A protein has these predicted regions:
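Bacterial carbohydrate/catabolite-sensing allosteric modules
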Residues: 1-57, 62-307, 312, 316, ...
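Short hydrophobic/aromatic patch on the recognition helix
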Residues: 315, 319, 364-365, 369
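DNA major-groove recognition helices of helix-turn-helix
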Residues: 322, 339, 372
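Short, Lys/Arg-enriched C-terminal cap helix and immediately downstream tail that follows
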Residues: 324-329, 349-351, 374-384
């Protein structure tokens, strides 16, 4: 029996993403590819005669020229960005509109009324994410106007971009003057870390006055903050794998898809930077604090009312006016959030997780977790990359 010839594939990612790269490498191992990094090509592409290429078509003119040369030769190419939508090329992209929706809904669930976007530059991907964030925000019933958009490279002269003090003053002037509590959405850990640092410098409390959410797969810069940063996991590894799979099919002769293939975000890791429900009503604010402090106790609305010294009707009315949900729904929401964090970050048994969330036993945890997420706790833990 004749063995299939190994395919020679070029990988040109600028800048390199280890998560996308791992997805590509995993498919390459399964398919038996010879995978070559663009940067390691001796003497450039001139003498290379491969079968296909995976690229990230951003603003690198050399990479754009590479793609043009490959396509003139008839070499299949798959792009892993949403940039340069005018270039007709097969793509496997992150679903930036879904990411924007997820961010807006996350902040709205926490009762934030004001929102803003901060980024260093402005790309087509940023436009998609912010556009979806703004559209979703505007459609939500309890928000106070459209989110503000702040882009450093648009609002500061080019000569000041690398002036750390000037950049700090730019951040500080916006953050000090913004309405509070403010929900801030950033495209990556670098911008969100800078927002957090400027909040500390200005004496602005995170998350009570400014809550911060970013996107990305690299969790080290999110975890290693004075206030750890919440993050939407974009799922770069799956994107890399699916892009490689599409390229393999194109080499086999499959017709390219008419539209870009989009990969939904993997999920959202809630950390301290958004782990807060904004409440201007003093009674609701006190109730929320009590629920958070006593989340491991198996108590409900009756015990909460006794502690606050108010009747259930009054408390329900205040919650409905302030949050649009009942005290019981908020207790359940906080319990599920706590359970999700424990499943993701610890190797505790389901019984231990249930106990720490104020639930009776693992069976009840499984019931409500499946109802709210569509997955049993064990499957959710595996999907989220938990212990």
């Amino acid at each position: 029996m004749q063995t299939q010839q190994r395919r020679d594939i070029l990988l040109a990612m600028v800048p390199y993403s280890p998560w996308r790269g791992e997805g590509v490498r995993r498919f390459a191992r399964e398919a038996g590819w010879n995978l070559l990094e663009w940067s390691s090509l001796p003497g450039g592409i001139g003498g290379w005669r491969g079968d296909g290429a995976l690229v990230t078509l951003r603003n690198d003119p050399e990479l754009a020229a590479l793609v043009r040369r490959l396509r003139r030769r008839g070499v299949p190419v798959v792009d892993m960005t949403a940039e340069h939508p005018d270039v007709r090329i097969p793509r496997v992209c992150l679903d930036s509109r879904a990411i924007g929706r997820m961010a807006a809904e996350h902040f709205a669930e926490r009762n934030f009324r004001h929102a803003a976007w901060f980024s260093t530059d402005w790309t087509h991907t940023h436009a998609l994410r912010f556009g979806s964030f703004a559209e979703t925000w505007a459609a939500l019933p309890r928000t106070a106007g459209p989110p503000e958009r702040h882009v450093l490279m648009e609002e500061m002269p080019r000569s000041r971009w690398n002036d750390s003090r000037a950049v700090g003053r730019w951040f500080a002037s916006i953050l000090r003057g913004a309405p509070k509590p403010l929900a801030v959405f950033c495209p990556g850990p670098a911008e969100s870390s800078r927002v957090a640092a400027e909040c500390r410098a200005c004496g602005i409390a995170v998350p009570e006055e400014v809550a911060i959410l970013c996107t990305g797969d690299d969790q080290m810069p999110c975890e290693n903050q004075a206030v750890p940063l919440s993050c939407i996991l974009v799922g770069g590894e799956r994107q890399g794998y699916e892009a490689a799979a599409l390229l393999d099919r194109l080499i086999d002769g499959e017709a390219p898809p008419k539209e870009a293939v989009t990969m939904p975000p993997k999920g959202l890791i809630v950390r301290a930077s958004t782990d807060f429900v904004a409440a201007s009503d003093p009674l609701v604010a006190r109730a929320l604090a009590l629920v958070a402090e006593n989340i491991s106790r198996p108590w409900g609305v009756a015990q909460l009312c006794r502690t606050l010294g108010v009747g259930p009707r009054r408390l329900c009315r205040h919650f409905a006016d302030e949050l649009g949900r009942s005290p019981g729904e908020e207790i359940q929401r906080q319990r599920l959030a706590r359970a999700a964090a424990l499943l993701r970050d610890t190797d505790l048994t389901l019984d231990a997780v249930a106990e720490r969330c104020g639930l009776c036993h693992a069976q009840y945890l499984s019931k409500i977790f499946r109802r709210e997420t569509g997955l049993p706790p064990g499957a959710w833990r595996k999907k989220s990359g938990g212990a």
